[in-house]
């Protein structure tokens, strides 16, 4: 047996509790929710957080293992990006949330076309910024580019994603909002 050094990635304790039954139940329910929905109308979104963590350390693990996780409550955040795409491979413009009180012009100097840029104190998406993403990027795309019929939006189950405003708009526009299990 040989071992190799890897940097562990951080995972929150509640994410480490996900069971096989949780995953099987999710996919059983998802199958029913996708019935009658065109692939062009099925979307998945996810936030990616880019960090500057000078405290990362290597650990010993088996060769061939691409990554190793370690359970930690917090990480130092720089900015977050929300990505969203359809089941047919259409990518919506991203939204970038910087950790700052004010937006600096230089951050948008080479902006991605139709991307949205915002700030929060933490650099994470919150209810306000998620609503902006939903209205300006996702709902805008649904209204202007999707086929008739039901739509599905699949993503994280963070509390800030479930504002009354977003839920009302999902109902109004025939969008089935499906939360992933903690992962």
Model-derived features: where do they sit?
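Phosphate-facing sequence motifs and polybasic nucleic-acid/acidic-lipid-binding regions
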Residues: 1-183
